[in-house]
């Protein structure tokens, strides 16, 4: 059973005006599909390792050397994007009281968390992701990864992620990444973040 491209949980234009429909079509139907195709091609070379990408990427040294980088790139790309779509919604949501308290305790305030996350997304050189994760100590942490690397490979559990590859924003925002990052905060699905936080603690 091969990895398949998940359907978007909303219409392509549902996140307008923050994320445009053209970008969503290209990002989901083309870019994410390519990661799925390439991950499947890599896995087909070693059927004995199975298809549990989370388990494989949590222990990258266990991945056969000839497909390791392909799975880091494309398996990571699939996992990151499958999560990313679920982390956005056209509905207005807010962090639960428990998550809000954890954010305040870790960062000082929601505004300081937003500033830290924005800085991680803005300063990630080239392509990559900004993340809010639950680290090995069970604490919240803002971090970023290069390319399609996943925090799972560092023993961290991602609960919020933002794709800062240019393909994620260039159609609408051109080279102004900070405007895209600001817009993302208008479409975050805090209900999903809460769910992931509860499961990760």
UniProtKB/Swiss-Prot annotation:
Enzyme Commission number(s): 1.15.1.1
Domain of life: Bacteria
Cofactor section: Mn(2+)
Family matches, as Pfam families: Sod_Fe_C (PF02777), Sod_Fe_N (PF00081)
Keywords: Manganese, Metal-binding, Oxidoreductase
Transmembrane segments: none
GO CC term, one of those recorded: cytoplasm
Functional note: Destroys superoxide anion radicals which are normally produced within the cells and which are toxic to biological systems. May play a critical role against oxidative stress, affecting both the survival and the virulence of S.pneumoniae.
Family indicated by similarity: Belongs to the iron/manganese superoxide dismutase family.
Subunit details: Homodimer.
Name of this chain's protein: Superoxide dismutase [Mn]
Organism this protein belongs to: Streptococcus pneumoniae serotype 4 (strain ATCC BAA-334 / TIGR4)
Phylogenetic lineage: Bacteria, Bacillati, Bacillota, Bacilli, Lactobacillales
